[in-house]
């Protein structure tokens, strides 16, 4: 695997300013941690995206897709691969009656505002979820009683052979924090949402209420990756962590949030090792106290 050879091949078909060598992943994750990616490509077109995938295969370099990096922990040694970032360069939105077709790179917060402006309801739950639409459908993101599978009609997905196909809701296999996209390594290009006509003022009030609940109950002022753990059946992860005496627990620059124990926050120059050591401490303590095995919701990637 020769990263310089791959870099040269990529810059022949993709503008050089969109291909970054040894790019620090802390600049591309909401946790603000993570070592360098060998190569990062930020494609602006589907053709550039396909070229990046094709060349990664030809150069025997694996590729990894990110959006806003808001559900991601990258280890300190970084990533020995080509990271392909699908973000604001893919953020077109169109409306056809109550149907919304949005590209995968749009932030959920921006999409929510556009949907609200059309007086369409059903997407309010997603208004405060950090991250892109592509990331949200990949993990079937949800909050406050709603999740992506409630509003998704279908999506265009790209496979590693460069083929694009439309998948229906059923074919997407959206489950609790999972989907066929995640299982098969597909890439979401755009998503079709089926919503309902609503009253603008009511939609605005619901959105404001959810925003207020988030602001008062979640540590939005500090870098984090959102909820660290999946919800164990019959329990709430945050309550188990708090009742295990871990609220405010710190390892290096990583801390269990004082505001919401389900969050780990970066209180200053945290390393991925700090975060991962704290995750292990939490898992061990919760198991010792309640005999409940916590599973991480965040994706943990990179070289050990």
Curated annotation (Swiss-Prot):
Single GO MF descriptor: UDP-N-acetylmuramate dehydrogenase activity
Lineage: superkingdom: Bacteria
UniProt keyword annotations, A-Z: Cell cycle, Cell division, Cell shape, Cell wall biogenesis/degradation, Cytoplasm, FAD, Flavoprotein, NADP, Oxidoreductase, Peptidoglycan synthesis
Catalytic activity entry: UDP-N-acetyl-alpha-D-muramate + NADP(+) = UDP-N-acetyl-3-O-(1-carboxyvinyl)-alpha-D-glucosamine + NADPH + H(+)
Pfam families, sorted: FAD_binding_4, MurB_C
Pathway(s) the chain acts in: Cell wall biogenesis; peptidoglycan biosynthesis
Stored Gene3D superfamilies: 3.30.465.10, UDP-N-acetylenolpyruvoylglucosamine reductase, C-terminal domain, Uridine Diphospho-n-acetylenolpyruvylglucosamine Reductase, domain 2
EC number: 1.3.1.98
Cofactor(s) the record lists: FAD
Gene Ontology CC entries for this record: cytosol
GO biological process: cell division; cell wall organization; peptidoglycan biosynthetic process; regulation of cell shape
Subcellular location: Cytoplasm
Domain (FAD-binding PCMH-type) ranges: 33-213
Catalytic residues, chain numbering: 177, 227, 297
Record family assignment: Belongs to the MurB family.
HAMAP family: MurB
Alphabetized PANTHER family for the sequence: UDP-N-ACETYLENOLPYRUVOYLGLUCOSAMINE REDUCTASE (PTHR21071:SF4)
Role description: Cell wall formation.
Record-given protein name: UDP-N-acetylenolpyruvoylglucosamine reductase
Gene symbol of the encoding locus: murB
């Amino acid at each position: 695997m020769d990263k310089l050879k791959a870099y040269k091949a990529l810059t022949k078909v993709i503008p050089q300013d969109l291909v970054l060598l040894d790019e620090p992943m802390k600049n591309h994750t909401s946790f603000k941690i993570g070592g360098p990616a060998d190569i990062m490509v930020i494609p602006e077109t589907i053709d550039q995206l396909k070229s990046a995938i094709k060349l990664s295969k030809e150069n025997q370099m694996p590729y990894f897709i990110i959006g806003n990096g808001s559900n991601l922990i990258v280890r300190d040694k970084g990533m020995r691969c080509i990271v392909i970032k699908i973000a604001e360069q893919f953020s077109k939105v169109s409306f056809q009656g109550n149907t919304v077709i949005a590209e995968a790179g749009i932030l959920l917060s921006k999409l929510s505002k556009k949907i609200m402006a059309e007086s369409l309801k059903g997407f309010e739950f997603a208004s405060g979820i950090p991250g892109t639409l592509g990331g949200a459908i990949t993990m079937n993101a949800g909050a406050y009683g709603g999740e992506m599978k409630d509003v998704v009609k279908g999506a265009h997905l790209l496979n590693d052979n460069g083929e694009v196909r439309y998948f229906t809701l059923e074919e997407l296999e959206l489950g609790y924090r999972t989907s066929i996209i995640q299982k098969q390594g597909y890439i979401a290009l755009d998503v079709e949402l089926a919503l309902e006509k609503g009253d603008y003022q009511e939609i605005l009030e619901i959105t404001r209420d959810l925003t207020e609940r988030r602001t008062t109950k979640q540590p939005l002022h500090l870098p984090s990756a959102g909820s660290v753990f999946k919800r164990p059946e019959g329990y709430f992860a945050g309550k188990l962590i708090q009742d295990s005496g871990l609220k405010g627990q710190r390892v290096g620059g990583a801390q269990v949030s004082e505001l919401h124990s389900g969050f780990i926050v970066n209180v200053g120059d945290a390393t991925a090792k700090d975060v991962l050591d704290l995750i292990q401490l939490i898992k061990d303590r919760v198991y010792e106290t309640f005999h409940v095995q916590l599973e991480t919701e965040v994706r943990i990637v990179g070289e050990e």
